Amino acid sequence: MTDLRHYDVIVSPAITEKSTLLSDNNQVVFNVAKTATKPEIKAAVEALFGVKVTAVNTLLRLGKTKRFKGLVGKQKDVKKAIVTLAEGQSIDVSTGL
């Protein structure tokens, strides 16, 4: 049985035009918790999906400042992880966990 904290590390798959292009290179993009480290992300992906991870790259997208009817607000910051899988392995992110 998978450890429940793995579900706290991986928030959701990031399904965008760029992330679908990365699937040609055996890479998958996930939104992850801001406090998640690369070893935690690697362990979570390997445990939840049963694949071998070769590399994890992370980035922090800062939220934009938005205005609506004169009020200033801010979007949330999002941490993304680009996970490189071993050759011949893949993850279908369109299905749920």
Swiss-Prot record:
This protein's record includes keyword Nucleotide-binding: no
A Gene Ontology biological process term: translation
InterPro entries to which the protein is assigned, alphabetical: Nucleotide-bd_a/b_plait_sf, Ribosomal_uL23-like, Ribosomal_uL23/eL15/eS24_sf
One MF term in the entry's GO annotations: structural constituent of ribosome
GO cellular component term of the entry, any: ribosome
Keyword Cell membrane: no
Protein keywords: Ribonucleoprotein, Ribosomal protein, RNA-binding, rRNA-binding
The organism's place on the tree of life at top rank: Bacteria
SUPFAM superfamilies per UniProt: Ribosomal proteins S24e, L23 and L15e
Assigned protein family: Belongs to the universal ribosomal protein uL23 family.
Function noted in UniProt: One of the early assembly proteins it binds 23S rRNA. One of the proteins that surrounds the polypeptide exit tunnel on the outside of the ribosome. Forms the main docking site for trigger factor binding to the ribosome.
SUBUNIT field: Part of the 50S ribosomal subunit. Contacts protein L29, and trigger factor when it is bound to the ribosome.
Listed NCBIfam families: PRK05738.1-3 (NF004359), PRK05738.1-5 (NF004360), PRK05738.2-4 (NF004363)
HAMAP family xref list: Ribosomal_uL23_B (MF_01369_B)
Protein name: Large ribosomal subunit protein uL23
Protein's organism: Rhizobium rhizogenes (strain K84 / ATCC BAA-868)
Gene name, Swiss-Prot/TrEMBL: rplW
